[in-house]
């Protein structure tokens, strides 16, 4: 170990003898002094003191700081706490300065500088209570601190002397002495080795001589009694002995008892030498151990932990070290165990691994020493009175381990006094203390003189100190205190300090330097070794040991310091008494330091390695080869390697002559050899030859022939070197001529260099083994070409590639499988045998062998050879054989027909043999045995020749008694059993056998059961333990998994962690939001339900109570009256309309007679479908009808306003306000209407697949003119389908179709939509401004629209357009009432309509008014007040309330605007029912959003605006046929301006966003046979087959299916809410192509699921054929549909036109699943309408006002069936067949209303 200290001569830098001087033991004590066995060495953990003592601490690591008792010395100065040496700052310098290692600047002649009691220059700071200003003290630092240093010299030594622990004296600051720390001994703590560095003297400077300015020598020195030194157990650890603190702390402690301060432990076992640590380390460990445990023999776990922790090793390693060290598992460490722990810690600190188990040798040694200690202990050995604090143990250990890390013993000073506590001094002076111990006691008195010098007791010394005192004072000269001389000593004058301190004085100043030791003699020797000063007291002799600590400070070198005490003798100054005590002993001490100086080199031990500098060469002997590399030049001496060779540096001095000059260089022999080296490296084995000589071999070796006789035969040994020797060597071959001939001898050895020729590697290919040694042939891979490639190719997942390229030439491969081959084959087998079955099946083998690319035949043959026993699989050996055969084949060898013996696997071979043997035994043994044959001879002894064998045979147990001669081999008796021949007598033996077998089986069963029970018991017994173990394992697994998870998460970056946290937060928020949404949904649902219940309170009261009955009766009566009134009004209006229509028709006929004739002829030619013809013929002769103004909010209007589903966009033509004068131009209008009707008829026919006779091109007519056109005609057509048919025949159908809204009906432009729609309603009347089918009719046409467009039930026939395939309308659209009509581009609601949309609350009222009143009133309004309506904003999208016009399912986009016809006119005739128009694509259908709220389910067939027809058509295609008749395809005629509510309703459908509100009243069952629809001009439905709008039933304005009134008639419950968008209620409001009619989709069965497929098939069958007569049809159609009161009276809640339920038997409830909608709120008043003709009493009871819940209740009671009152309107549209010609009853209109 190298030490940072310069003094590395000894273990810690104090000489080769570890600082022990002759005549002194290791502790510096005279050998004859027993009991003073102080430890020599300083604590390995000690480090230089900090200015205030130990590094970072004020006390020794293991000392508890005792309160520094401040002594009030006689001078009245508070004594400084002991140990607080003021000037420890210089102690560091003094640390190792003793041997001059440290600067001698302060050659504190004071007692051993460590003791600094000598003239420690630091005394200056140590004002020993003397006048501190007297820095005259040593070094100016000693600010006149009186002779403070002297104090140490004389009295100074007194407390400081305590052990040199004069520092302790410092605490005694007898106010003067205290500062006197000059004893500096505080620094002297070196006694504790801290300051021991004699060089520490400088520190004395800081040691203000405890003399405070008051320098009162009178300070009672008694406190100084070095007796405190007792506490200073000299033991190095005694330094920790708290008692030492007494130097300053303990009041004049009793003189140290003869305590063996040096050796606390009496156990001799402690002296046992442990081999695994060095002696020095063991000594250090012993010191540490003793200082830690005090007087105890074992170290507690707490202190052990404190010490171990300071090593800063990981906790895991410390735990392991403790476990390994505590061999007795007692929780305490004895000394050997502690050494073992320190040893292990040292391993850890040096980076070496700590073994898991202590090596047996070390363990045995430790255990032996532990046992010895255990046996040697006294049962009552002293226990430590005060345990060492754990913190102290940690500090001490830190210093220890710090020393390890520094590779130098930590300065023993570490234990130095804690600054005030002088405690360190204890250790330093402990020896002295012992010296002062009993001997010191006198010293006390010795000090007393000093004290008297300082105090009266010092009197004698006083003089000694007085000079100092004066010296400390500026007038140090007077030195009154007896220190005066010293003072001069501190100053130059101090030198004369005769006063016994004189030397010290000089010591205090440079002159004092000698005085340092307090002994002038020491000063010369000391100058470093002030150690003698220690002995400032005769008792100090024992203190020598006290110096040992100093020595430890110096470590062993301190021993000489002991002798340093001899100089103390000169310390006569103040110490004269002590000096005598010190003299003899001190004398040697003085010299102690001189020797130390050389020891400083400490190289002696290190030199040992140097000595071995050649040792490494030892191995070089061998041929010098090692030397050659390392030596090269150095090798020249080669002494190493062969001491004898050293002379032979040349390697062959004798040979040198023979070497010729060249050999001289050979001296370097190695240099040339260097190349040879390489040659020789192979020679390494040849060491035996020339090993030593090799370097110098060359010729000189010749005589030596390798220096070894054995080499002589190896003479050739050099020949190989010759190649390496450079050419010159060649001649030298061996440097010996004799070797020359031998050179051949080396040829074999050429392996060294020329071994290359000896490539005997050829031997490798020669396989070994015998043919039978399967798998043991040792053939090198070099002889097996391609085997590696084969192995790689056969591995799983190997890239496919042929092996043929690897095997290109034929090579003879031995039959036997070599070891390498077998290894490769086994690897392949293991790679494929994933399940470790031990066999590979055919599939795997096929895949493997297939890699070889051999033919299938060859592989089959190989398989057959290898698959022994035909198992279908190959085991490991068989697989190897197969691969070997493949390998041979790849190398060009043929596959043998039979496996050679070498290839027969042992397992197979042996198995076969065994099997054969067993077979033979089975076959032959039992049948051929002859029990009584020769082999069955008796083995009994024959006792007599006369014995009769026959007599003994029966008793002979050696004979086989059973005779099997008759027995044959086993033959199954079941083969040819002949039951007949079986004899009964054979049974008993069988039974017996069976019984015996049963008994044996029972026995076996019993035995097995016992075994099973035993196993169960064992298992049960083991179960708890297993469970516990399993639980613990599971717990461990979980904990490990948790740890893994934790580590994996902890290793993640903060970003990931934050993101995870964020994700969790978001997830939590999402889940919370979802739950909140669910709660809100539930809340909404519950509130909606409560709202509905609140609104429906009338339905909730007890229906059976008298009050309820009375209420119902009153309601029914009132409604019946209203219905009667409405019926009458409707009838009147109908009659008026009829007349009006008739007049118009007549006019038209008159003007268009030729065309009409042609039409009739055309119809008669069967060109038109029969049903169409019937309808046309049934149309009544047009009669002029009195124009009646009808309120626009008629259902027909609303439905007309619904956009036609056609995608063709027609610009919305706004009906300009038309004055009544517009009607004057009836002829023009009639012509235009006719043209439009003809066009529509052609479109219808085209849609039905009938080629129209001619396509009526709408004659262009100005919008105004169109609007001015009399609306009556369409109205009549709407009212009278039959008439419409007739009108059609005379081209009137076009007129009637267009009448509903003449100008607007004809959309000017049809914007093509993606799907080609039937141009129904697309045909533009040139006379009218083009309006989109979906757009509201031109306001100008509003008057007509009010009357006709709303009244017309069927749009005029449209030219048939190729029907697009029926779009697969989603069930949702089918299920729900008209989906929110996505307003098609062509179905733009008029702005008026949009603006007029009623608010939601108003919607119902409007529905009520519209549905109830608008049916007839709208007709009347339209007829009577067409001009007025024209001025009103028409709801272009509002379908006619009356005419849910069934439009052929032609593409919605192509649907031509269907002009509503007069309510009385049936305009359906133009539309042949046979061919349904192609349904619009689903995409074009508005989602099946309930466009109509409950009130929207107005049973009236709403007539849709031209554009709305097509949309209705497409959706209707999915409706059941019955419903299709009511499809809400509005007539293309633009609706007349509706009442705002109606307009709103009509426009509502345009609002696609409005969700479909399924109304509990929405009809849900398709109306198979529509009955008279109130005020709905059935013309559309009549005129069009159900296929036109297969999906739509009768629809109200809102687009919802027409709610059937109680009478079963569809009631026109058109919500007329002014502002709310009616999208939810009136899908026909704008007839958006995609919007399914609000009617329950025809495609829904009773469960509202798709039936439209079937129903569409029936569309054509259910088409409107014809009605019996127009009047009857109109009566039935409008009888129940007439508004309860004229639409013109919006305030009144319109009631269903149907008569009260009581008035007539209620027809079966309409098939709608939802009851008719409650009456809507009254519609806004509109133009007064002619009272509708009274409805026939026989008609079904009118549906109560849709907006009235009581009406709804009445409807329910009358039979109207509520199917589902749900938010989603799944009600089926009331879609009966328009005209069910099959039954020939006009009641077919009601379809399935019942």
From Swiss-Prot:
Annotated region (Disordered), positions in chain: 651-674, 717-747, 925-956, 1183-1227, 1249-1287, 1303-1794
Composition skew (Low complexity), residue ranges: 651-666, 717-732, 1265-1276, 1407-1418, 1499-1530, 1539-1553, 1610-1622, 1694-1704, 1737-1746
Membrane topology: Peripheral membrane protein
Domain EF-hand, chain residue ranges per copy: 313-348, 854-889
Biological process, per Gene Ontology: actin cortical patch assembly; endocytosis; endosomal transport; intracellular protein transport
Molecular function per GO: actin binding; calcium ion binding
Residue stretches of biased makeup (Pro residues): 1356-1368, 1705-1736
Main location: membrane
Domain WH2 as annotated: residue spans: 1748-1765
GO cellular component: actin cortical patch; cell cortex; cytoplasm; endosome membrane; nucleus; plasma membrane
Localization: Cell membrane; Endosome membrane; Cytoplasm, Cytoskeleton, Actin patch
Domain EH positions: 281-369, 821-910
Function statement: Component of the PAN1 actin cytoskeleton-regulatory complex required for the internalization of endosomes during actin-coupled endocytosis. The complex links the site of endocytosis to the cell membrane-associated actin cytoskeleton. Mediates uptake of external molecules and vacuolar degradation of plasma membrane proteins. Plays a role in the proper organization of the cell membrane-associated actin cytoskeleton and promotes its destabilization.
PANTHER family named among the record's database cross-references: EH DOMAIN (PTHR11216)
Designated name of the protein: Actin cytoskeleton-regulatory complex protein pan1
Organism: Schizosaccharomyces pombe (strain 972 / ATCC 24843) (Fission yeast)
């Amino acid at each position: 170990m190298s030490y940072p200290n310069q003094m590395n001569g000894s273990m810690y830098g104090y000489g080769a003898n570890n600082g022990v001087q002759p005549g002194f033991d290791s502790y510096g004590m005279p050998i004859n002094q027993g009991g003073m066995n102080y430890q020599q060495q300083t604590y390995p953990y000690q480090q230089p003191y900090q200015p205030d003592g130990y590094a970072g601490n004020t006390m020794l690591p293991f000392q508890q700081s005792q309160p520094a008792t401040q002594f009030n010395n006689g001078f009245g100065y508070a004594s400084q706490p002991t140990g607080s040496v003021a000037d420890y700052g210089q102690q560091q310098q003094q640390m190792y300065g003793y041997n001059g290692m440290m600067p001698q600047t302060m050659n504190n002649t004071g007692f051993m500088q460590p003791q600094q009691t000598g003239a420690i220059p630091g005394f200056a700071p140590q004002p020993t209570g003397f006048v501190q200003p007297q820095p005259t003290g040593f070094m100016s630092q000693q600010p006149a601190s009186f002779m403070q240093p002297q104090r140490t010299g004389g009295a100074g030594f007194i407390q400081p002397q305590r052990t040199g622990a004069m520092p302790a004296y410092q605490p005694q600051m007898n106010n003067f002495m205290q500062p006197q720390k000059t004893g500096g001994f505080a620094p002297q703590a070196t006694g504790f080795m801290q300051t021991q560095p004699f060089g520490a003297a400088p520190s004395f400077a800081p040691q203000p001589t405890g003399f405070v300015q008051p320098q009162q020598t009178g300070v009672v020195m008694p406190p100084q009694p070095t007796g405190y030194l007792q506490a200073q157990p000299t033991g190095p650890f005694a330094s920790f002995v708290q008692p030492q603190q007494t130097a300053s702390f303990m009041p004049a402690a009793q003189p140290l008892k003869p305590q063996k301060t040096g050796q606390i432990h009496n156990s001799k076992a402690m002296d046992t030498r442990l081999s695994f640590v060095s002696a020095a380390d063991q000594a250090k460990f012993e010191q540490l151990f003793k200082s830690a445990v005090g007087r105890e023999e074992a170290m507690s776990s707490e202190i052990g932990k404190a010490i171990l922790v300071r090593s800063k090793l990981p906790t895991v390693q410390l735990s392991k070290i403790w476990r390994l060290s505590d061999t007795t598992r007692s929780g305490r460490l004895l000394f050997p165990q502690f050494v073992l722990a320190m040893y292990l810690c040292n391993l850890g600190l040096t980076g070496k691994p700590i073994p898991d188990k202590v090596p047996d040798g070390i363990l045995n040694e430790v255990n032996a020493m532990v046992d010895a200690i255990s046996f040697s202990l006294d049962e009552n050995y002293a226990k430590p009175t005060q345990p060492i604090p754990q913190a102290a143990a940690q500090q001490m250990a830190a210093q220890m381990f710090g020393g390890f890390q520094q590779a130098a013993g930590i300065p023993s000073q570490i234990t130095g006094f804690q600054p005030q506590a002088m405690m360190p001094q204890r250790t330093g002076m402990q020896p002295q203390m012992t010296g002062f111990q009993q001997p010191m006691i006198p010293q006390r008195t010795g000090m007393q003189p000093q004290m008297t010098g300082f105090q009266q007791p010092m009197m004698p010394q006083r003089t000694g100190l007085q000079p100092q005192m004066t010296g400390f004072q500026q007038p140090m000269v007077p030195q009154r205190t007896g220190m005066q001389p010293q003072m001069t000593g501190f100053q130059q004058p101090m030198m004369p300090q005769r006063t016994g301190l004189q030397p010290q004085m000089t010591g205090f100043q440079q002159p004092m330097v000698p005085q340092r030791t307090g002994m002038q003699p020491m000063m010369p020797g000391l100058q470093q070794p002030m150690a003698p000063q220690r002995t400032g007291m005769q008792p100090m002799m024992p203190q020598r040991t006290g110096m040992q600590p100093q020595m430890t400070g110096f470590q062993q070198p301190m021993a000489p310091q002991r002798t340093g005490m001899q100089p103390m003798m000169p310390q006569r100054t103040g110490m004269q008494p002590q000096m005598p005590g010190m003299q003899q002993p001190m004398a040697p001490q003085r010299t102690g330091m001189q020797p130390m100086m050389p020891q400083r080199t400490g190289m002696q031990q290190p030199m040992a390695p140097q000595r071995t500098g050649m040792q490494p060469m030892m191995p070089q002997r061998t041929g010098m080869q090692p030397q050659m590399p390392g030596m090269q030049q150095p090798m020249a001496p080669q002494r190493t390697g062969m001491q004898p060779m050293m002379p032979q540096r040349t390697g062959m001095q004798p040979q040198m002559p023979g070497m010729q000059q060249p050999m001289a260089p050979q001296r370097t022999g190695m240099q040339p050899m260097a190349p040879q080296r390489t040659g020789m490296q192979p020679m390494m084995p040849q060491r035996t030859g020339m090993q030593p000589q090799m370097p110098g071999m060359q010729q000189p070796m010749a005589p030596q022939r390798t220096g070894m006789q054995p080499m002589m035969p190896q003479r050739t040994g050099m020949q190989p070197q010759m190649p390496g020797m450079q050419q010159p060597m060649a001649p030298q071959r061996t440097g010996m001529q004799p070797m020359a001939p031998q050179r051949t001898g080396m040829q074999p050895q050429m392996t060294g260099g020329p071994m290359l020729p000896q490539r005997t590697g050829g031997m490798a290919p020669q396989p070994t083994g015998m043919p039978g040694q399967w798998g043991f042939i040792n053939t090198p891979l070099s002889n097996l070409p391609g085997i590696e490639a084969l192995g790689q190719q056969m591995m799983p997942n190997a890239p496919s590639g042929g092996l043929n390229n690897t095997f290109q030439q034929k090579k003879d491969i031995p039959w036997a499988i070599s070891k390498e081959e077998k290894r490769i084959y086994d690897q392949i087998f293991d790679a494929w045998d994933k399940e470790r079955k031990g066999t590979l099946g055919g599939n795997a083998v096929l895949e493997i062998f297939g890699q070889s690319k051999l033919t299938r035949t060859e592989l089959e043959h190989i398989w057959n050879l290898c698959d022994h026993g035909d198992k279908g699989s190959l085991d490991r050996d068989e697989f190897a054989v197969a691969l070997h055969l493949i390998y041979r084949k790849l190398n060009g060898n043929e596959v043998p027909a039979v496996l050679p013996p070498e290839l027969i696997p042992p397992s197979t071979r042996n198995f076969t043999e065994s099997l054969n043997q067993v077979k033979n035994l089975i076959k032959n043994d039992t049948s051929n045995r002859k029990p009584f044959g020769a082999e069955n001879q008796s083995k009994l002894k024959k006792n007599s020749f006369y014995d009769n064998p026959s007599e003994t045979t029966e008793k002979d147990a050696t004979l086989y008694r059973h005779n099997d001669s008759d027995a044959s081999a086993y033959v199954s008796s079941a083969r040819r059993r002949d039951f007949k021949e079986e004899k009964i007598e054979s049974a008993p033996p069988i039974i017996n056998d069976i019984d015996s077998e049963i008994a044996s089986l029972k026995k076996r069963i019993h035995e097995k059961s016992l075994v099973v029970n035993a196993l169960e018991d064992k298992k049960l017994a083991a179960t708890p333990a297993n469970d516990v173990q399993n639980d613990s394992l599971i717990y461990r697994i979980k904990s490990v998994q948790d740890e893994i998870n934790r580590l994996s998460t902890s290793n993640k970056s903060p970003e990931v962690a934050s993101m995870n946290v964020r994700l969790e937060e978001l997830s939590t928020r999402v889940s919370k939001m979802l739950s909140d949404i669910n709660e809100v949904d539930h809340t909404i649902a519950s509130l909606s339900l409560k709202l509905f219940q609140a609104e429906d309170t009338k339905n909730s009261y007890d229906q059976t109570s008298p009050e309820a009955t009375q209420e119902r009766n009153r309601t029914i009566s009132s409604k019946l009256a209203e219905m009667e009134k409405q019926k009458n009004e409707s009838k009147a209006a109908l009659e008026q309309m009829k007349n009006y229509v008739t007049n118009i028709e007549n006019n038209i006929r008159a003007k268009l007679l030729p065309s009409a004739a042609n039409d009739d002829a055309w119809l008669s030619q069967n060109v038109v479908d029969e049903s169409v013809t019937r309808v046309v013929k049934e149309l009544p002769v047009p009669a002029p009808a009195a124009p009646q103004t009808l309120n626009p909010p008629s259902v027909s209007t609303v439905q007309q306003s619904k956009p036609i589903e056609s995608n063709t966009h027609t610009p919305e033509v706004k009906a300009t306000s038309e004055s009544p004068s517009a009607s004057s131009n009836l002829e023009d209008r009639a012509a235009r209407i006719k043209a439009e009707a003809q066009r529509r008829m052609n479109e219808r026919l085209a849609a039905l697949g009938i080629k129209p006779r001619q396509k009526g091109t709408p004659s262009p007519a100005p919008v105004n003119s169109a609007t001015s056109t009399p609306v009556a005609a369409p109205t009549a057509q709407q009212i009278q389908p039959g008439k419409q048919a007739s009108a059609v025949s005379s081209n009137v159908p076009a007129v009637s179709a267009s009448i509903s809204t003449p100008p607007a009906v004809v959309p000017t432009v049809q914007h093509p939509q993606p799907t080609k729609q039937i141009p129904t309603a697309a045909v533009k009347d040139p006379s009218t401004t083009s309006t989109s089918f979906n757009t509201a009719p031109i306001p100008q046409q509003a008057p007509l629209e009010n009357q006709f467009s709303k009244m017309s039930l069927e749009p005029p026939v449209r030219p048939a357009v190729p029907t697009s395939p029926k779009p697969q309308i989603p069930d949702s659209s089918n299920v729900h009432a008209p989906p929110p009509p996505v307003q098609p581009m062509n179905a733009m609601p008029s702005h008026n309509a949009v603006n007029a949309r009623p608010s939601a609350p108003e919607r119902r009222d409007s529905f009520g008014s519209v549905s109830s009143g608008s049916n007839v009133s709208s007709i009347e309004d339209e007829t009577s007040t067409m001009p007025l309506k024209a001025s009103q904003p028409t709801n272009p999208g509002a379908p006619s309330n009356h005419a849910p016009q069934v439009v052929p399912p032609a593409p919605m986009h192509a649907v031509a605007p269907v002009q509503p016809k007069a309510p009385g006119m049936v305009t359906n005739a133009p539309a042949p029912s046979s061919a349904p128009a192609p349904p619009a694509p689903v995409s074009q259908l508005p989602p099946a959003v309930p466009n109509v709220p409950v009130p929207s389910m107005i049973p009236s067939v709403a007539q849709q605006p031209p554009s709305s027809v097509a949309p209705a058509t497409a959706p209707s295609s999915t409706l059941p046929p019955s419903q299709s008749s009511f499809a809400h395809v509005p007539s293309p005629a633009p609706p007349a301006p509706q009442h705002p509510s109606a307009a709103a309703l009509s426009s509502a459908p345009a609002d696609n966003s409005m969700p479909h509100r399924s109304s509990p009243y929405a009809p849900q069952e398709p109306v198979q046979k529509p009955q008279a629809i109130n005020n709905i001009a059935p013309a559309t439905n009549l005129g069009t087959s159900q296929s036109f709008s297969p999906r739509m039933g009768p629809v109200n304005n809102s687009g919802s299916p027409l709610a059937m009134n109680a009478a079963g008639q569809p009631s026109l419950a058109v919500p007329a809410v002014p502002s709310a968008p009616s999208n939810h209620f009136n899908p026909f409001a704008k007839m958006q192509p995609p919007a399914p009619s609000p009617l329950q989709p025809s495609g829904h069965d009773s469960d509202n699921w798709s039936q439209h497929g079937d129903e569409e098939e029936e569309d054509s069958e259910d088409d409107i054929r014809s009605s019996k007569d127009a009047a009857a049809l109109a009566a039935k159609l409008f009888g129940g549909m007439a508004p309860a009161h004229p639409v013109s009276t919006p305030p009144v809640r319109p009631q269903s036109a149907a008569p009260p339920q009581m008035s007539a038997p209620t027809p079966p409830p309409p098939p709608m699943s939802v009851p008719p909608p409650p009456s809507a709120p009254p519609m806004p008043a509109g133009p007064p309408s002619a009272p509708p003709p009274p409805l026939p009493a026989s008609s079904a009871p009118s549906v109560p006002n849709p907006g009235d819940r009581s009406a709804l209740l009445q409807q329910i009671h009358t039979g109207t069936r509520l199917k589902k009152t749900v938010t989603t309107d799944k009600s089926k549209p009331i879609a009966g067949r328009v005209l069910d010609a099959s039954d020939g009853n006009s009641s077919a209109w009601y379809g399935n209303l019942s």
